[in-house]
């Protein structure tokens, strides 16, 4: 009788504990979020599109690339066939990604450099990282940001830009402009892929001699392992990883890993440039080998992060997204411009979301736009009520969780292209000119140029 009473009391005690969770215990149940977005990674450059279960669902051929980790990840994920970068250029997309706004509202209508003071991430809006931070998340940014107007604020050389070229493109982002990111290992923009540099949380510069995606994946893994006690293990985390490759340059082994280049070096160009609108005789055609090599290297770096999540037991409660800021035409469409155009090669970006036991692996033709990403990420993390009122994008988390959700799907996606407008006497751009506006549906693309 006494033992039965002890069991009963113990059970009641356990019930009471379960009914009175501490804030920390509740917080621990919030999902972690990792958003990985290499630069200039087109949607077609993923091997799984040519595999059974995928190829019959799309109307394009995949590039002949090797992406074994993305192949496996796709079979565990919701994969969008038609995610679009509305203004397919680095800084404007990043502005939309962070704010949930189109370029005319985010503060970033043009690529950021020191001649464009009108193009810089707004300080007076809550970015996705601000919302996560306010919800109790540890927030970390790794890699390329390219969302700030460069100023002469080099921590190592006060009063100077972080680079000597004019205009300056690279930038140091001080703590008061990091929008809730409490851990920082990032830079503005810099295109020496095996000679990258980063500023850490305290402004110290690091110059590793390592291919940047692999270096960044290593730093992310150190963060996940909490080496150096860099995060609060009681808090969920929100991580953004802005890898630079396969962004140009893509012309030598200085730009990619040799082991990846060897997969493509002996392939005839017309066996690599297989899109029906591609021209293997263009001067740029040789670049495809280095571009695809970088794609394969990014795949490997991404896989290392996935392996660490599993090893640490974090994979089940972590939302992982793989995407890009825009695509790459790579000898298609008779243009030398790799981006900033209404073509599918430029606008159509990867968008894969894995959330084990919460999101069913499948394909969906949702035409997700750049401003939709921020509110959708917040919705996936259970923070729909915290989406700022000024966000222009839509929260498609209900559709991600349930493909039959009663939600209006977009009929298409806007296309936006801006160029420099009026300049002052010092050559600074003081306005932008809307050079093209358009609309892309599942079947048609309309783009009007001025």
Where do the protein language model's features map onto the residues?
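Formylglycine-dependent sulfatase
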Residues: 2-5, 9-13, 20-449
């Amino acid at each position: 009788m006494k033992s039965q009473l002890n069991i009963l009391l113990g059970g009641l005690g356990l019930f009471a504990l379960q009914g009175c969770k501490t804030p920390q215990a509740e917080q621990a149940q919030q999902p972690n979020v990792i958003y990985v977005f290499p630069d200039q990674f087109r949607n077609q450059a993923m091997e799984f599109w040519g595999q059974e279960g995928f190829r019959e669902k799309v109307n394009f051929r995949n590039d002949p690339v090797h992406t074994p980790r993305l192949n496996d990840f796709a079979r565990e994920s919701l994969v969008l066939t038609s995610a679009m970068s509305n203004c397919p250029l680095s800084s404007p997309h990043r502005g939309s990604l962070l704010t949930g706004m189109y370029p005319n509202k985010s503060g970033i209508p043009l690529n950021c450099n020191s001649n464009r003071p009108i193009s810089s991430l707004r300080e007076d809006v809550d970015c996705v990282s601000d919302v996560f931070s306010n919800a109790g998340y540890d927030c970390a940014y790794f890699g390329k940001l390219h969302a700030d107007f460069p100023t002469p604020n080099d921590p190592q050389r006060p009063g100077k830009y972080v680079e000597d070229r004019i205009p300056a493109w690279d930038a140091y982002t001080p703590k008061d402009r990091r929008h809730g990111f409490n851990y920082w290992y990032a830079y503005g923009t810099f295109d020496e892929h095996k000679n990258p540099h980063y500023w850490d949380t305290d402004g110290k510069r690091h110059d590793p001699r390592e291919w940047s995606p692999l270096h960044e994946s290593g730093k992310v893994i150190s963060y996940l392992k909490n080496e150096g006690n860099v995060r609060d293990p009681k808090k969920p985390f929100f991580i953004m990883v802005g890898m630079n490759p396969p962004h140009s340059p893509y012309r030598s082994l200085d730009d990619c890993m040799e082991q990846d280049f060897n997969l493509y070096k002996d392939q005839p160009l017309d066996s690599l440039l297989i899109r029906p609108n591609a021209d293997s005789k263009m001067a740029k055609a040789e670049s495809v080998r280095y571009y695809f090599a970088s794609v394969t290297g990014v795949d490997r770096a991404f896989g290392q992060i996935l392996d660490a999540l599993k090893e640490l037991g974090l994979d089940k409660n972590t939302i992982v997204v793989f995407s890009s800021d825009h695509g790459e035409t790579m000898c298609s469409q008779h243009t030398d411009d790799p981006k900033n155009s209404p073509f599918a090669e430029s606008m159509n970006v990867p968008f894969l979301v894995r959330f084990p036991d919460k999101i069913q692996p499948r394909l969906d033709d949702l035409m997700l736009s750049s401003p939709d990403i921020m509110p959708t990420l917040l919705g996936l993390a259970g923070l729909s009520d915290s989406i700022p009122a000024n966000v222009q994008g839509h929260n498609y988390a209900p559709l991600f969780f349930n493909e039959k959700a009663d939600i209006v799907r977009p009929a298409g996606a806007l296309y936006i292209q801006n160029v420099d407008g009026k300049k002052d006497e010092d050559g600074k751009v003081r306005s932008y000119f809307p050079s093209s506006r358009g609309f892309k549906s599942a079947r048609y693309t309309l783009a009007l140029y001025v």
